[in-house]
Amino acid sequence: MTGVELEIILKAGKILLSSGAEISRTEDTMNYIARAMNFKDLEAYVSNRGIFATAKKADGTEITRICNVPEVDINLSKIESVNALSRRITQKNITIEEIESELNQIDTMSDYSFFWRLVAYTLGASGFSYAIGSSITDSIIAGIIGLILGVYMCTIKRILSSDVLITILGSILIALLGNLFIHFELGSNLSVILLGAMIDIVPGVPFVNAIREYSQNNYNTGITLMMGALLTCISMAVGVAVVQSLLFNTQMIPLYTSNLDTNSLTSMFMRSIMAGIGTTAFAILFRVAKQHFIDCTILGFISWFLFLTLSSLQSNVMLSIFISGFIIAIASRILAVKRKCPAIVFLMTSLFPLLPGLSFYRSIYYMLMGQETIAISFAKESFLIAFTIAISIVIVKHIKPPRIRKNTYK
């Protein structure tokens, strides 16, 4: 074991963490690579902001490395690439120099173009606005606002480095545009327009991941993710509240998950299709490889259609969330085997229609607006949904796949 090998292991872990991988996946991948390099004495402490690792050389001396992990920027293609590289390493058909070179290539992997990111912001806002109950006109307006937000988000980071300030200004922009469309009678329902546009910046994934890390006893990481999601939602709520309080007095009607339109099969089908399209948008924003877009779209459609169908058959929202999340988690696991990539590629995108980020944001917004009863209701809904989704994922993760017996008869 040399210092170079340990640094390679840490670099693989750093790429995974900074790309949005969970702690357990990062630890497992590092251990797989370590065993493939023929040493069993790696001791590593992994958190979402750093990796501390110690190993022994052949002469018995210890080497220690500390690796700082930058802010998470979700890139599922990088996670998939590191996963594929780790499989090649375990097969022992690659040199140390080749591993180091490939990790450098993965770390500097190119992003989707400015055009495709704008397409993603537009489709995400329009698709999810329609999925949660807007009219076609309002969903188009949400898409236009999403497009403008995309231009803002893709350019503002060249000027500002504060995520809090970027989010506040972005939410002010969304609220201003939404209210202007309503003022000129181009739209009818401000709530669904704003919620659709907000979906592009809502922290639904960190919120659920925080609960997942809690469930795996990674309390420090869970607290960090939860506080990050809370701060993002506060920033969003502050921006919208400022616009609503100082400039406009448009009444926003609370939209609860239990009140979605499930009366018509055609309506549920069309809204689920738009949820699938919105899922594709997040596949672009999360840098999923293009060959997985169809899978993500289909799973996004299925997750929302299952939820709407189950909600139409019974009144327990959490049961609908659990069954939908459980089925999608199983489907993601099956696809991961067939496509030879991590399940997170499908799971993180296809569950997006079910994520509670919007409810979390609304709980803070209504608290700021002095409507405590509504705020508590949305806070309760967001935490229950997050726990329900996390439980469904954890259950599927701990289900052992059946062993397939090979026919040994000649």
Residue positions per predicted region:
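Membrane-interface helix termini and inter-helical loops of multi-pass transporters
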Residues: 184-190, 247-265, 366-378
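Short juxtamembrane and helix-loop transition motifs at transmembrane-helix boundaries
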Residues: 97-109, 122-134, 149-161, 250-263, ...
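Structural signature of hydrophobic alpha-helical transmembrane segments
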Residues: 129-145, 189-203, 258-274, 312-326, ...
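Soluble N-terminal domains of membrane-associated systems
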Residues: 1-101, 105-107
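Hydrophobic alpha-helical transmembrane segments
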Residues: 115-119, 139-144, 165-169, 226, ...
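Alpha-helical membrane-inserting segments
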Residues: 127-132, 148-157, 173, 177-185, ...
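Core alpha-helical transmembrane segments of integral membrane proteins
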Residues: 111-208, 284-286, 290-295
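C-terminal transmembrane helix-loop-helix hairpin of multi-pass membrane proteins
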Residues: 18, 193-201, 209-234, 308-410
